[in-house]
Design a protein with these regions (language model features):
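Flavin (FAD/FMN)-binding glycine-rich loop and adjacent Rossmann-like elements that form
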Residues: 6, 54-56, 78, 121, ...
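Flexible loop/turn segments at secondary-structure boundaries
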Residues: 28-29, 51-54, 105, 144, ...
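N-terminal Rossmann-like FAD-binding beta1-loop-alpha1 element of flavoenzymes
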Residues: 19-42
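A short, glycine/Asx- and small/polar-enriched loop/turn
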Residues: 145-152
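Extreme N-terminal leader/targeting segments of oxidoreductases
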Residues: 1-19
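Ligand-binding pocket scaffold of soluble enzyme catalytic domains
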Residues: 13-17, 27-28, 162-163
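Soluble non-cytosolic domains of exported or imported proteins
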Residues: 26, 114-118, 382
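Conserved N-terminal/central alpha/beta ligand/cofactor-binding core
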Residues: 8, 34, 40-41, 47-143, ...
Length: 423
């Protein structure tokens, strides 16, 4: 590839920050809010024009199960707070058994919530702005500025041109490990199937909403690619995308939007409308940190001394996991940390970590870790994890699951439940 030499003096933003959060998805929102509640000056940078990431802009508006499939809630903390907030101002679908908290009697019905993505986006923005978090929209992080393995800050690109922002702790929650990769942190790329969905309405769905008096009934899904989580339905011979290059992202979007058009073009044109296309590529796994530990599918029912939160399998009942702090860090990088989709998990464990509730809990942990690192003067890769666990626990996060929740009936443990579609 040809190269050119390019050099310029980049202005430095007058304000420096304790914590700079790159990425306004649910993990980034959780990290930013946690650090701000601890009194830190926080900058949240989002490349699009709304908060929420895949949960809002990406139209994957589902809190997957936060319980064990037998009526016991596992995931609490900011995940519970955000779930309740997501349904406060817009339409909501929560199973009746869970509308008032954990049910009094065991149930196989799982604790999920579907919500209005756009109303959640604007309501959470109002919430964060009132909390005093500084937010930059339509701004891309183009590069970290490194001093060895220490990140001095980030080069930003926006309507003001290029500028540099300083931060004591940098949290990469871009979803694609963009900062980590460019900082030289070891990373691992994923592969994504031919999957794409958008939201629309039809005459039939609108009639149903009128009859039910529930606007949620008006909303239907339209699909481009229809491959499932495991690749079922992925066209033979079609390549997978890792989503880490401009060409890959563009090819994914072009193929899927063309397929969507082919599917709807012959329908009566007055009978349906696409209300919104996803504002980002709906990749599941693109690039993540090669962390100090990598969570594996077979780690279910395993306890970790450095757990930052217990989580559950969103497809299989009973399967419980703990997220070790080491999935967010890489030793030697003293002020870089990640969370959410960029956390270190392989195979199906990566899928477990990337969905909304676990992403929020790991984001909450990253925010708390940033606070501890700043207050103690230690590197974020060497903080007192027991202090982090105490902070998480004080914020209603279950650190270790109770072994009493491990079923003795191995035949029913791990049963797959409802198919939650494109997640």
């Amino acid at each position: 590839m040809k190269t050119i030499a390019f050099q310029e003096n980049i202005p430095v933003r007058e304000t420096s920050f304790d914590v700079v959060v790159a990425g306004g998805g649910v993990a980034g929102i959780a990290a930013a809010l946690t650090a701000r509640r601890a009194g830190k000056r926080v900058l949240l940078i989002e490349k699009s024009t709304m908060l929420g990431g895949l949960a809002t802009l990406g139209l994957i508006n589902l809190f997957v199960p936060m319980c064990n499939g037998r009526g016991k809630q596992i995931i609490f903390g900011l995940a519970e707070e955000f779930l309740r907030f997501s349904v406060k101002y817009g339409w909501a679908i929560i199973p009746e058994e869970w509308r008032n908290g954990e049910p009094a009697t065991p149930t196989n019905v799982r604790y999920i919530a579907r919500f209005s993505p756009h109303i959640f986006a604007i309501s959470i923005l109002d919430f964060l702005a009132d909390a005093g978090i500084e937010i930059l929209f339509d701004t891309i992080v183009s590069a970290p500025v490194m001093d060895g393995k220490h990140c001095r800050g980030l080069i930003l690109e926006g309507k003001s041109g290029r500028e540099f922002v300083e931060g004591k702790i940098i949290i990469d929650v871009t979803g694609d490990a963009d900062i980590l990769r460019r900082a030289g942190v070891p990373t691992v790329t994923g592969g994504n199937f031919h999957t794409y969905c958008c939201k629309g309405i039809t005459l039939e769905s609108c009639q149903k909403a009128v009859e039910s008096r529930n606007i949620a009934d008006a909303i239907v899904g339209f699909r481009g690619g229809s491959a499932n989580l495991y690749g079922g339905g992925h066209p033979e011979g079609m390549p997978l995308w890792n989503g880490t290059s401009t060409d890959q992202v563009s090819d994914f979007l072009i193929r899927n939007q063309q397929e969507l058009f082919r599917k709807i073009k012959d329908q009566p044109k007055d009978s349906r409308e696409i209300v919104t296309l996803p504002g980002m590529a709906q990749f599941r796994t693109t690039c993540r940190i090669d962390g100090d530990y990598t969570l594996k599918e077979e780690d279910h029912y395993r306890h970790f001394d450095d757990s930052i939160g217990a989580i559950c399998d969103f497809e299989r009942r009973d399967f419980l996991y703990e997220m070790p702090y080491r999935i967010l860090t890489r030793s030697g990088y003293d002020n870089l940390i990640t969370a959410g989709r960029c956390a270190s998990g392989e195979g199906y464990a990566w899928d477990i970590l990337r969905v909304i509730p676990p992403a929020i809990i790991s984001g909450q942990a990253a925010g708390n870790a940033a606070v501890l690192a700043i207050d103690s003067g230690k590197g974020i890769d060497s903080i007192d994890v027991s202090a982090l666990q105490r902070l998480q626990s004080s914020q209603n996060v279950m650190i270790h699951f109770d072994d009493a929740l491990i079923p003795s009936d191995s035949e029913t443990s791990g049963e797959r439940g409802e198919d939650y579609g494109h997640i």
